Amino acid sequence: MATFFGEVQSVFSRAVDEDDEEEEGEEEEEDREIIAELERKREVHVTWNPEVTAAIESSPNRRLPCSNVILSVGDNATGFVSSYILSSGSWEVCGSITLWNERCRDCNPRKDSLPAPSSCTFYRSITDPTVLLCQCNSYIAEDQLFQWCEKVFGSLEKSSLNVTVLSTCPVSEYKTPESTYSLPVPFLKALRTSEYREEVPCPLLEQPNIADGLPAAVLTYCQVWQIPAVFYRCYTDLSKLDSITIDAFRPLLSCQRMSRLAADSAKIQETLRKTVKSSEIQSNLYI
């Protein structure tokens, strides 16, 4: 190319440029392989027991008939379900969810009937097989939330489905013009989809408070699919499992769907005592 006298031109080498392009192409291919491997590793796996699998496969639309799903998220919510509902003994383990992310390494399907401390476990009512409970102590990453909902609810018949979600939240995150120090902690708030018509035993969650994590993902999924769903959030000032926060969920037993699932009071108190004691032992560094 013609140029004027004294102009400095940059040196161009076709060979070097082609080598750089080849290296960049190799790096991009390697990056794509790494991303694909991570995506495979972060897949959410839902495993049902043989009876449920057979029921799904024999169904005309290959979905499990289901009238009620109760999802408990976190230690205190699962503690309530374990003490007040599962302690009746009329439940059986029917499935589990395994996943992998930066805070959860529960990636291997379980072969026994006992839930792992950091797993999602499904229980089915023996007296009414259309009722399912899911206890979730796992951390579900943001990129896994939609997949979680798709995998779980994609296996269930939605025509007569109702969903109830329980979780806790630090009272410091509750947005109110009043001081949180004056609030009667712990306390319940409810958030429901437009299809949910039943009365709730506590005040509704006020704006600008919002749901997040798995409860928000489940509620959003139910809103889109027009599934009646309600989310009960317990605001507490304690981060660990404790009987006071667990008992804060007791008003839910006044709901018709929950009251018929409640265990006997003697079994409730015994299981509650064991649950709290077990948590205290595990949190003691000297034991």
Curated annotation (Swiss-Prot):
PTM entry text: Degraded by the proteasome upon completion of 20S proteasome maturation.
Bias kind Acidic residues: ranges: 17-32
Cystines in this chain: none
Region Disordered, annotated ranges: 1-32
GO biological process, one term: proteasome assembly
Main localization category: cytoplasm
Keyword annotations: Chaperone, Cytoplasm, Endoplasmic reticulum
Localization terms from the record: Cytoplasm; Endoplasmic reticulum
Gene Ontology CC entries for this record: cytoplasm; endoplasmic reticulum
InterPro entries found in the cross-reference section: Proteasome_assmbl_chp_1 (IPR016565)
Complexes and interactors: Forms a heterodimer with psmg2.
PANTHER family referenced in this protein's UniProt entry, alphabetically: PROTEASOME ASSEMBLY CHAPERONE 1 (PTHR15069:SF1)
Family: Belongs to the PSMG1 family.
Function recorded in the entry: Chaperone protein which promotes assembly of the 20S proteasome as part of a heterodimer with psmg2.
Protein name: Proteasome assembly chaperone 1
Species annotation: Xenopus tropicalis
